Amino acid sequence: DYYRHVYNGKHDVYRGTVGQPFTEHHATGTYSSDLFADAAIDFITRHQTKQPWFCYLPFNAPHSPNRKNKLPKQANEWQAPPAAFARYGMSEKEADPKRRYMATVTALDDAIGRVLDCLDEQGATDNTFIFCFSDNGAFRLNREGIDMGSNEPLRGGGVTCWEGGLRVAAIASFPGVIAAGSIVDQPLWSPDLMITYANLTDAQPPRIRLDGKDALPVLSGRAPSKHQAFYFEFRKHAALRLGDWKIVRTKPDEPWQLFELKGDPSETDDQSAANPEKLADLIHEFKSWQTEF
């Protein structure tokens, strides 16, 4: 719930500092995207020093509404502040899920805009690396007509290991390093961000095996992605990508399917029978990764 800050029936907003226990942050009635943006703006304003800083800003919108997060008799619908509805001439009682979703995304866009405006006001934009992405593809579970996003032409969606669940767009900005308007068609994944920010801030990452690689050489167009393989498991789903090839299964006891993503990004043409050697190579790579975990 974007106003009560409840997830799975429990309060899910906390405030904590280093060396102190995390405590619940009760801001009932404040829209979550605004709450998170306010916290980020406060952090940025307080950290305008010569020391590097890092701000992780995980908005929860537009995550799908869920009845488990609602009060009895409360409608299971997209939520947005009044101004977001008014932008399109709608009332807060708008019944069309698609239009309510539009208001939710608009409110998120406004919140992000306020954070970016703060960077401008602090004179920090030109020396700040910004990376914005989704944690998964749009949900396509057809729940009560509220799943609005589209992953076309990719197969599947959030909480699956099909490309529609794994492959998401991202927006990056770093003036003087990443060319404005440039498009990067190279595979990266979220573990890359830890290494990237550590390198930018001269922080020392843990001396353990890390799966991330610095993303800036790729985003700036100076080098291709160094990734050879990507490993995924979520609940019963599993997948591994090696170059342009990918294996995927939706249950541990079912056979793997094999797809060549460059020519078949929609994962419609299973190549497992036609390419048994390639299938065996990817299964071997998957087991190697699985052993490490």
Predicted segments — roles?
Residues 1-191, 198-209, 249-255, 262-268, ...:
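Active-site-proximal cap/lid insertion segments
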Residues 5-6, 231-233:
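Short solvent-exposed loop/turn micro-motifs enriched in small/polar/acidic residues
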Residues 13, 238-242:
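Short acidic-hydrophobic surface loop/beta-edge motif
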Residues 120, 220-225:
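Basic phosphate/pyrophosphate-binding loop/patch that engages nucleotide-derived ligands
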Residues 158-163, 229-231, 237-238:
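Short Gly/Pro-enriched turn/cap motifs at secondary-structure boundaries
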Residues 209-212, 228-232:
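Short catalytic/ligand-gating loop segments at beta-alpha or beta-beta junctions
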